């Protein structure tokens, strides 16, 4: 089996340990820093692995998912590890699961974001955000069901995957991964009644801003814009999870959502 390994720069030591364990079992096509560009990984079909392992945190997995077409396996070396199915201490289990292809294929759809600075693909979210020195900004959101106006510091447009990230911290709802919808969540809105809006994934929305703001896609600032179009992309990404994976357990463990507490306060 052909596999590749990407790692975050400051996790090269544990990544090398993963490499040493895997190399006697699989054909390792590459072992590379995820912050660098390697277009041949995507473009050269003869070089394409059957799976790629990402050693790092959620940010590393996000970068890797955008580099490759094949499924990605996250090995947690960071903090939360929403995208990670394995710990560094579980590499032996990962080897067996790879040999038997014993995984849950967790497929997630993403957003296509069109703007004057380019076309981008958001796995978690696309954020329109004013600068610190700017006054409050007016956002106009046009869709099939009408036009909505927001007076806020910014807007977060998130996928179901991203609904448990930045949007959740802003008070937005968690959208289950299999729900065909995305959400718009305002940042520091002027009116307290302004809350998240959940939109069918069939919608294509146009967002117009009263002043130039930063467009941030999955945490990366890509430029200044006044207008963007957002819709569901035809592409999907695939994460390989252990057979024991389920979403409800993940959000309980990672962020404490929906945990049951006993009378003494313990879980």
Could you tell me what each predicted segment is?
Residues 1-51, 55, 63-67, 87-106, ...:
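ATP/NTP phosphate-donor binding region
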Residues 60, 64-68, 167-171:
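Short Gly/Thr/Asp-enriched flexible loops that form oxyanion-binding sites at enzyme active sites
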Residues 57-60, 78, 161-163:
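Short glycine-rich anion-binding loops that position phosphate/pyrophosphate groups of nucleotides
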Residues 78-153:
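Catalytic core of DAGKc-family lipid kinases
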Residues 66-78:
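Gly/Ser-rich helix-loop-strand patches that form or flank binding pockets
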Residues 54-59, 155:
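Glycine-rich phosphate-binding loop
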Residues 120, 128, 133, 144-148, ...:
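ATP/nucleoside-binding phosphotransfer catalytic cores, i.e., glycine-rich phosphate-binding loops
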Residues 152-193:
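Gly/Ser/Thr-rich active-site loops/lids in small-molecule metabolic enzymes
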């Amino acid at each position: 089996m052909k596999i590749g390994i990407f790692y975050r720069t400051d996790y090269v030591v544990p990544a090398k340990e993963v490499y040493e364990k895997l190399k006697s079992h699989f054909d390792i096509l590459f072992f590379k820093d995820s912050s660098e560009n390697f277009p041949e990984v995507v473009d050269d079909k003869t070089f394409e692995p059957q799976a790629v392992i990402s050693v790092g945190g959620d940010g590393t997995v996000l970068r890797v998912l955008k580099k490759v077409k094949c499924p990605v396996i996250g090995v947690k070396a960071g903090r939360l590890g929403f995208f990670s199915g394995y710990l560094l201490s579980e590499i032996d289990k990962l080897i067996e699961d790879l040999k038997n292809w014993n995984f849950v294929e967790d497929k997630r759809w993403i957003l296509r974001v069109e703007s004057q600075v380019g076309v981008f693909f958001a796995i978690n979210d696309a954020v329109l955000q004013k600068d610190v020195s700017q006054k409050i900004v007016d956002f106009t959101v046009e869709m099939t069901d009408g036009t909505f106006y927001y007076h806020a510091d910014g807007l977060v447009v998130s996928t179901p995957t991203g609904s448990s990230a930045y949007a959740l911290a802003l008070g937005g709802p968690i959208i289950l991964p299999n729900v065909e919808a995305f959400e718009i969540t305002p940042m520091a809105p002027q009116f307290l009644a302004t809350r998240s809006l959940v939109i069918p994934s069939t919608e294509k929305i146009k967002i117009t801003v009263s002043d130039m703001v930063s467009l941030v896609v999955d945490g990366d600032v890509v430029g200044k814009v006044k207008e963007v179009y957002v819709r569901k992309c035809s592409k999907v990404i695939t994460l390989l999870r252990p057979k024991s994976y389920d979403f409800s357990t993940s959000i309980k463990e990672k962020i404490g959502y929906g945990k049951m507490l006993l009378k003494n306060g313990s879980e």
